[in-house]
Amino acid sequence: MKSLKGTKTAENLMKAFAGESQARNRYTFYSNTAKKEGYVQISNIFLETAENERMHAKRFFKFLSEGLDDEAVEINGASYPTTLGDTKKNLIAAAKGENEEWTDLYPSFAKTAEDEGFKGVAAAFRLIAAVEKEHEKRYNALLKNIEENKVFEKDEVKFWKCIKCGYIFEGKTAPKVCPACLHPQAYFEILSENY
């Protein structure tokens, strides 16, 4: 890889690295809140997304470490969210951050990288932007479930799975308590067969 020294791409990569790193930590905090509020599936999704963000940060950092000789990168004009509330507020903040990444930040970072001759960096920004779009979609769907009181109740009959013991229940509403292992409703989610 050619040198990133003195490029706008180096600054953008560092902004992206910092943003992804902070998102990872925020999502870990949000996961704890969701679990405390009885949303175990949402907690797990925050943790899964935190791991996705860690991998994005790693990809951006690898470009930096390959394109610079152990040099620090100063970033100006970047701001990072500080939201920490209940699960609903956290989902709103998370969706907003993901939206900004895929609609504004990463497309502009990709264009700059391409203009500066860093095609691999540009491609990474575009591919990761596509992931961020899916993150936003998922956060908005989870938010809608909370707002419509549909986390543990659906309009049609579903198969609900206890993620602690594997018990499967058929109905419109997840049981208040798992009859097999006695864990609370918080541990039920819609059965997913994606194999």
From Swiss-Prot:
Question: What induces this protein's gene, according to its Swiss-Prot or TrEMBL record?
Answer: Various environmental stress conditions, e.g. oxidative stress (exposure to air or H(2)O(2)) and other stress factors such as salt, increased pH, high concentration of solvents or cold shock, do not lead to increased transcript levels of this gene. Is not repressed by PerR.
Might you give the EC number(s) for this enzyme? 1.11.1.1
Q: Which domain of life is it from?
A: Bacteria
The residues the record assigns to binding Fe(3+) 1 are E20, E53, E101, E132
Regulation of activity is described as: Rubredoxin (Rd) increases the NADH consumption rate by serving as an intermediary electron-transfer shuttle between NROR and RubY.
Which positions are annotated as binding Fe(3+) 3?
A: C162, C165, C178, C181
Name the InterPro entries on file: Ferritin-like, Ferritin-like_diiron, Ferritin-like_SF, Rr_diiron-bd_dom, Rubredoxin-like_dom, Rubrerythrin, RUBY_RBDX
**Record keywords, A-Z:** Electron transport, Iron, Metal-binding, NAD, Oxidoreductase, Peroxidase, Transport
Which reaction(s) does its UniProt entry say it catalyses? H2O2 + NADH + H(+) = NAD(+) + 2 H2O
Q: Which residues bind Fe(3+) 2?
A: E53, E98, E132, H135
PANTHER family with a match to the protein in the record? RUBRERYTHRIN-RELATED
> What does the record note on quaternary structure?
Homodimer.
Q: What's the name of the protein?
A: Rubrerythrin-1
What is this protein's gene name? rbr1
